[in-house]
């Protein structure tokens, strides 16, 4: 086959052959195969050129994708699939990028976990799930997590939650709120409970009573639209008890309130 036309199209070159076939190639392909108009290619040369052209194009796509942030092997492969790069070419590109240290799942996991320690609020269980979603294998994640101390981060997160809710909830409800939030963020139950030891949950009776009054008013406005009489009283009691208030305190308030 003879090349009848070579035309630059933005970042690629359009090559047309005398058998009416056309294809896009990278500049690296032009240089490597010394392509020019009227050059004759046999079938083997043409197949080699096509393979290299897609490899070069796919690698350029991958490097562009990696220029924004670190990515996992799977993320790069998925990106290339979206651009219709063939599977065997993707495998070659991933191998090259690994050899050239553009991608490294272990380093990515380590960086992700370290950044969370500095600026994040996630515990090890959630971190592992997020890394697995990126396609990183457990054997690349688990050793790093096992060597990372999450106690200070748990204390930092619990303190932030304490500051946010201490004027809104009684001690028991506040403890439950912080514990549940830490569990949701991926910290272990033991770590969540241990982090509470660094917080001061002491509230005087007047503070608790003020909180109870405020919550009772709130729940009454909500529930009195649907209920009245004994049913309303029951609903108010249940709502306040779930919030962590003492049963005797609730009953005393309800006697004077209704």
Curated annotation (Swiss-Prot):
One of the protein's GO biological processes: regulation of DNA repair
Superkingdom of source: Bacteria
Keywords: Cytoplasm
Cellular compartments per GO CC: cytoplasm
Cellular compartments annotated: Cytoplasm
Function, as annotated: Modulates RecA activity.
NCBIfam families hit by this protein: PRK14135.1
Record-stated family: Belongs to the RecX family.
Protein name, per record: Regulatory protein RecX
Designated gene of the protein: recX
